[in-house]
Swiss-Prot record:
Topological type in the membrane: Single-pass type I membrane protein
InterPro entries: Cadherin-like_dom, Cadherin-like_sf, Cadherin_C, Cadherin_CBD, Cadherin_CS, Cadherin_N, Protocadherin/Cadherin-CA
Residues that span the membrane, as ranges: 693-713
Signal sequence segment: 1-28
Encoding gene (name): PCDHGA9
Lineage, opening ranks: Eukaryota, Metazoa, Chordata, Craniata, Vertebrata
Record-given protein name: Protocadherin gamma-A9
A GO term for molecular function: RNA binding
An individual GO BP term: nervous system development
Species this chain originates from: Homo sapiens
Keyword entries, A-Z: Calcium, Cell adhesion, Cell membrane, Glycoprotein, Membrane, Repeat, Signal, Transmembrane, Transmembrane helix
Entries under Pfam families matching the protein: Cadherin, Cadherin_2, Cadherin_C_2, Cadherin_tail
Stretches in topological domain Cytoplasmic: 714-932
The Cadherin domain, residue ranges: 29-133, 134-242, 243-347, 348-452, 453-562, 570-683
Length: 932
């Protein structure tokens, strides 16, 4: 054989070291003590705390305790001293019977370590029992012809002690015919025999009396005696003889009582009474005599009670056969009890660690239990198992002890409770099993933050809500339990329009209901962005955030506002001019209105609510343009009153009305003449303050008119047409009208002074408005126009209009009239489209409203640029490219600036040095300038 290699030697050495280590560990975990029997309760066996390397106080802290397997607890732990003491009186003979060594084994569990330590205690014997015979007297019959040397068995004494304290010797009282011989059996038992030394003579003595003494070797020595009565019989030649020297039989432990086991037969060659044999148990202990019965006539042995293999698996006894003549024979009977699988496994729970934290690491001990089967062989082999698909595993720790361990990290949110069934099954046929059911609770840890059902929330709230209104409820779910799942809601700190978010909304910390702390106005702001935080009450607390956007929905809470015509503060209405020669579709004026709402709440519709002459005028549904519906007739009244209603499309719709007064005349003098003939109620009285104001304005107007007339006279003295000058002067003497005088030149400036008489039929007052001078070059700079801030002064006239003579007027100059191209509208020469489509979205509508408001502001301030082209009122340059009539109702051109009858010329035409295409009057003036 080849020599082993170095690798093989190294491997064997490692294996040897491992085995030695395991043996050392096993030995180290086994603690041995000894204690004498019959000690009192509380006898100190050993210092177990020292042997476990623990302090006495740690026995309670670490929950150290004794675990045993169904046996009465013989020992206990003293937690104060850390010692192992007896729990009561210990009787070695009762505990271990005749075993040479009486060992008591149990386990000590250190629960916090989940570790078992083996404890072995040897109970030492003391000489507390004396040898004892089963009977106090014994009769022995011997035939007188017995040959010296014959031997007669004597009963044995029983001593439950062991060792030197057990039976050691027999002594026979002195006698000339008998002696004592002691035989030692295979099992070490001492068997006394009576030996005949001299022949007996019945005629000499019919009986002999002997005393047999049994003694042990203990200190003090104990003994007992039995009296032997020997009867000398007449001649009996043959003694009973058994067919077998030793009888052996096997029996199952589960046989019922009365089951026949065997028949021990002895034969006697004598006849008559000397040949009749009687049977009885000779050497049998008290327990065996209760389990078996013997027929004294037949020698049949049967069971008297049920046998139990686990209690005793082997029985040995002797049977005596005696004939009528007193001769005896003996035989030995050996009964083996065979095990059957009649015991189910026994499961004893040693420790149960419930509840267990869900974050317990893998391999955490949940259960420690003992599984034992009292049967033997395969019937006593136990296999334990648990149901499948659980997060646990079983491990056989040592001997019959098993540990239930966690196989993975537990999750309370998936399973908060486990119902575990442990099944212990033996290997017998058929197999028997035992089940135990345990309920394991899993305690929660705060390992889950609250979770919202959505990544973000969009909430819609109508404006003008009541304070304290419930807006929305956010819900966050925390799968943890108890305090770890109690969610607290809060809002992240933020600032909106300079104010803390907490002044606008609040949230209920328990329910997550969001409340409005103020009444929201869509026109102030339209949405709020906030962050909701959900925190649990665990330790440490976990939280999560969600974005919530609150949209304020517009409500129809604003009625349309009419920008033009603007109502004077005294409640009167303005007068619009319509020539009698106007054709159907003639643009008289335009009503401009806006709505501060949005969406369809701001979509406006115009309609003619009331008219003094039905059918004469029409109003554009979307544009607000007031046009003639038919040609004017002579029978039509001079003054026409129209009530135009503007209504939005909200629910419910809101509306506003404006009253328009339309004067039908071809020129301003005609208007004044016609209006002068109107009767004004005389019961209207003006205040003194109004009178003073009118007088002051009249004086200033006269001075200003004088200055203007003088200036014009000096400038126009070279004009060839004195008739035109006289006509103009006569016209100014009667009615102050607006003058627009332009001087051609590269750097010439034009100062325009405008006057406007606003005469109403409902008032005796006339309003004379003086705007500030407007300096502009021929290009009419938009910048300079935007700087104009009109100063309006009202002059009230106390005199009745009908009493004032009007100077006859010359034919109106075409320069003073509005051409069709210069009328307010989308186009100077085309009728408005009343069927335009509405904007398709809120953004377009809001942009359109912004443009209308901007245009209206410029109109109110008098700063609107007039050079943007005819019919656009200066809006085309800024807003023209975005929206046209073909797309949306033309709110951009709803800005109409009254009070001026100047010709709206094209700025581009002026820059080119070309006169605008006006009336004939312009052409004549231009020709005269060239001549000059």
């Amino acid at each position: 054989m080849a020599a082993p290699t170095k690798c093989q030697l190294r491997g064997r050495l490692v294996l040897l070291c491992s085995l030695l280590g395991m043996l050392w560990e096993a030995r180290a975990s086994q603690i041995r003590y000894s204690v004498p029997e019959e000690t009192e309760k509380g006898y100190i066996v050993g210092n177990i705390s020292k042997d476990l390397a623990l302090e006495p106080r740690e026995l309670a802290e670490r929950r150290v305790r004794i675990v045993s397997r169904g046996r009465t607890q013989l020992f206990s732990l003293n937690p104060r001293s850390g010692t192992l003491v007896t729990a009561g009186r210990i009787d070695r003979e009762e505990l271990c019977a005749q075993s040479p060594r009486c060992l008591v084994n149990f386990k000590v569990l250190v629960e916090d370590r989940v570790k078992l330590y083996g404890i072995e205690i040897e109970v030492t014997d003391i000489n507390d029992s004396a040898p004892k015979f089963q009977a106090e007297s014994l009769e022995v019959k011997i035939n007188e012809i017995a040959v010296p040397g014959a031997r007669y068995p004597l009963p044995e004494a029983i001593d439950p002690d062991v060792g030197v304290n057990s039976l050691q010797s027999y002594q026979l009282s002195p006698n000339h015919h008998f002696s004592l011989n002691v035989q030692t059996g295979d099992n070490g038992a001492i068997n006394p025999e009576l030996v005949l030394e001299r022949a007996l003579d019945r005629e000499e003595a019919t009986a002999h009396h002997l005393v047999l003494t049994a003694s042990d070797g203990g200190e003090p020595r104990r003994s007992s005696t039995v009296r032997i009565h020997v009867t000398v019989l007449d001649t009996n030649d043959n003694a009973p003889v058994f067919a077998q020297r030793i009888y052996r039989v096997k029996v199952l432990e589960n046989v019922p009582p009365g089951t026949w086991l065997l028949t021990a037969t002895a034969s006697d060659l004598d006849e008559g009474i000397n040949g009749k044999v009687a049977y009885k148990f000779w050497k049998i202990n008290e327990k065996q005599s209760l389990l078996f019965q013997l027929n004294e006539n037949t020698g049949e042995i049967s069971t008297a009670k049920s046998l139990d293999y686990e209690e005793c698996s082997f029985y040995e006894m002797e049977i005596q056969a005696e004939d009528g003549g007193g001769l005896k024979g003996w035989t030995k009977v050996l009964i083996s009890v065979e095990d059957v699988n009649d015991n189910r496994p026994e499961v004893t729970i040693t420790s149960l660690f419930s509840p267990v934290r869900e974050d317990a690491p893998q391999g955490t001990v949940i259960l420690l239990f003992n599984a034992h089967d009292r049967d033997s062989g395969k019937n006593g082999q136990v296999v334990c198992s648990i149901q499948e698909n659980l997060s646990f595993t079983l491990e056989n720790s040592e001997e019959d002890y098993y540990r239930l361990l966690t196989a993975q990290i537990l999750d309370r949110e998936k399973a908060s409770e486990y119902n575990i069934t442990v099944t212990a099954t033996d290997r017998g046929t058929p197999p028997l099993s035992t089940e135990i059911h345990i309920t394991l609770q899993v305690t929660d840890i705060n390992d889950n933050p609250p979770a919202f059902s959505q990544a973000s929330y969009s909430v819609y709230l109508p404006e003008n809500n009541a304070r304290g209104t419930s807006i929305f409820s956010v819900i966050a779910y925390d799968p943890d339990s108890n305090e770890n799942s109690r969610v607290i809601y809060s809002l992240a700190e933020d600032t909106i329009q300079g104010s803390p978010l907490s002044t606008y909304v609040s949230i209920n910390s328990d329910t997550g209901v969001l409340y409005a702390l103020c009444s929201f106005d869509y026109e102030q702001f339209r949405d709020l962005q906030m962050q909701v935080t959900a925190s649990d009450s665990g330790s440490p607390p976990l939280s999560s955030n969600v974005s919530l956007r609150l949209f304020v929905l517009d409500q129809n809470d604003n009625a349309p506002e009419i920008l033009y015509p603007a109502l004077p503060t005294d409640g009167s209405t303005g007068v619009e001019l319509a020539p009698r020669s106007a054709e159907p579709g003639y643009l008289v004026t335009k009503v401009v209105a806006v709505d501060r709402d949005s969406g369809q709440n701001a979509w406006l519709s115009y309609r003619l609510f009331k008219a003094s002459e039905p059918g004469l005028f029409s109003v554009g549904l979307h544009t607000g343009e007031v046009r003639t519906a038919r040609a004017l007739l002579d029978r039509d009244a001079l003054k026409q009153s129209l009530v135009v209603a503007v209504q939005d499309h909200g629910q419910p719709p809101l509306s506003a009305t404006v009253t328009l007064t339309v004067a039908i005349a071809d020129s301003i003098p005609d208007i004044l003449a016609d209006l002068g003939s109107l009767q004004i109620p005389a019961d209207l009285e003006a205040s003194d303050l109004t009178l003073y104001l009118v007088v002051a304005v009249a004086v200033v107007s006269c001075v200003f008119l004088t200055f203007v007339i003088t200036l014009l006279a000096l400038r126009l003295r070279h004009w060839h047409s004195s008739h035109l000058l006289r006509a103009t002067s006569d016209g100014l003497a009667g009615v102050p009208t607006s003058h627009f005088v332009g001087v051609d030149g590269v750097r010439a400036f034009l100062q325009t002074y405008s006057q406007e008489f606003s005469l109403t039929a409902d008032s005796r007052k006339s309003h004379l408005i003086f705007p500030q001078p407007n300096y502009a070059d021929t290009l009419i700079s938009q910048q300079s126009c935007e700087k104009n801030e009109p100063l309006c002064v009202s002059v009230d006239s106390k005199f009745p209009i009908e009493d004032t003579p009007l100077v006859p007027q010359a034919p109106p100059n075409t320069d003073w009239r509005f051409s069709q191209a210069q009328r307010p509208g989308t186009s100077g020469s085309q009728n408005g489209d009343d069927t335009g489509t509405w904007p398709n979205n809120q953004f377009d509508t809001e942009m359109l409203q912004a443009m209308i408001l901007a245009s209206a502001s410029e109109a109110a301030d008098g700063s609107s640029t007039l050079g943007g082209g005819a019919g656009t009122m200066g809006l085309s340059a800024r807003y023209g490219p975005q929206f046209t009539l073909q797309h949306v109702p033309d709110y951009r051109q709803n800005v109409y600036i009254p009070g001026s009858n100047a010709t709206l010329t094209n700025a581009a035409g002026k820059r080119d040095g070309k006169a605008p295409a006006g009336g004939n009057g312009n052409k004549k003036k231009s020709g005269k300038k060239e001549k000059k």
